[in-house]
A protein has these predicted regions:
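A short, proline-enriched helix->beta-strand linker immediately N-terminal to the Walker B motif
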Residues: 153-157
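Helix-to-loop junction immediately C-terminal to a conserved catalytic motif
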Residues: 54
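Conserved ABC ATPase signature
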Residues: 134-138, 142
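Conserved ABC ATPase "signature" region
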Residues: 112-130, 181-188
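ABC ATPase NBD coupling module
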Residues: 70-85, 106, 111, 115
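Short helical segment in ABC ATPase nucleotide-binding domains corresponding to the A-loop/adjacent helical element
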Residues: 97-105, 115, 119
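Catalytic Walker B motif of ABC-type/P-loop ATPase nucleotide-binding domains
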Residues: 159-163
Length: 227
C-alpha cells in the first residue's frame, strides 16, 4: 500500500507540499480496480506529487513508502509503478508496437517477447492490427489507449495517471471515461497485485466522481479529504 510520511516539497519560495502524511484508503467495493482521485487547481503541485511518488523528482523532505518500506533508495525502474503522462508522451520515432514494448525492453525482456506481449495488450483494448502504425497517424482516443497499454503491459503495482483526459476534446473525454476502467481491467491482468490501484490526478470534479472511489484535494500544500 502507498503511504506518504511528512512529505514536503518547495519550488523556490513556493511550498507545494507541507509535511503531507497520507495512507491509501480502504475501498469497500472496487470490482478489482481501486481509484483514488487527487483534485486541485493548476499549479497546486498535483503532478509534482505524482512525479515524487514515481521517483522522477525528489522531495525536499519526508518519504514515500510502499508496503511499509521506504522507497528513498529504490530507483525508478525498480519501484514497479507506471506513470501515464498528461500528453501521452508517445515516441514519434517508434511504431505503436514498439512504443508499448518499450517498458518491457527496459526491464530486460527480449525484443521478440516484448513485441508479442505488446500485440496481445493492444488486442485487449481493441487495437488489434495497430502494431505497425505510426503513433502520429492515430486519433486522440487511440493515442490515449496506446499510452495506457504501454503503462500497464509491465503489470505495475500502482498506476499513476496525470490528467489522462485533458488532451482530448470534451465529447471524447466523456466517451472514453466510461470505458477507461474496463480497459484497465483487460490490459492489467493482476499478476503483481490482486487489486489494481490507480492514483488519478485531475482538475475535473465530475471526472473524479465518475471514476474515483475516494478523493482528496491538494490545497495550500495539504491533502484535504473530499469523499
Amino acid at each position: 500500500m502507498l503511504e506518504l510520511k511528512a512529505l514536503t516539497k518547495r519550488h523556490g519560495n513556493a511550498l507545494l507540499l507541507d509535511a503531507v502524511s497520507w495512507q491509501w484508503p480502504t475501498v469497500a467495493q472496487s470490482d478489482g480496480v481501486e481509484v483514488v482521485a487527487l483534485l486541485g487547481p493548476s499549479g497546486a503541485g498535483k503532478s509534482t506529487l505524482l512525479r515524487i511518488i514515481a521517483g522522477l523528482e525528489a522531495a525536499t523532505s519526508g518519504e514515500v513508502l510502499w508496503a511499509n518500506r521506504s522507497l528513498a533508495t529504490v530507483p525508478v525502474e525498480r519501484r514497479g509503478f507506471a506513470l501515464m503522462f498528461q500528453q501521452f508522451a508517445l515516441f514519434p520515432h517508434l511504431n505503436v508496437r514498439d512504443n508499448v514494448a518499450f517498458g518491457l525492453r527496459e526491464q530486460g525482456v527480449s525484443k521478440a517477447a516484448a513485441r508479442n506481449d505488446a500485440d496481445a495488450a493492444l488486442v485487449s483494448v481493441g487495437l488489434a492490427g495497430y502494431g505497425a502504425r505510426a503513433t502520429t497517424a492515430l486519433s486522440g482516443g487511440e493515442q490515449q489507449r496506446v499510452a495506457l497499454v504501454r503503462a500497464l503491459v509491465t503489470q505495475p503495482k500502482l498506476l499513476l495517471l496525470d490528467e489522462p483526459f485533458s488532451a482530448l476534446d470534451a465529447a471524447l473525454r466523456g466517451q472514453l471515461r466510461a470505458a477507461f476502467l474496463d480497459d484497465i481491467r483487460r490490459a492489467w491482468d493482476g499478476r503483481t497485485e490482486s487489486v489494481r490501484r490507480v492514483l488519478l490526478v485531475t482538475h475535473d470534479e465530475a471526472e473524479a466522481r465518475q471514476m474515483g472511489h475516494h478523493a482528496w484535494r491538494l490545497e495550500k500544500g495539504a491533502l484535504v479529504p473530499l469523499w
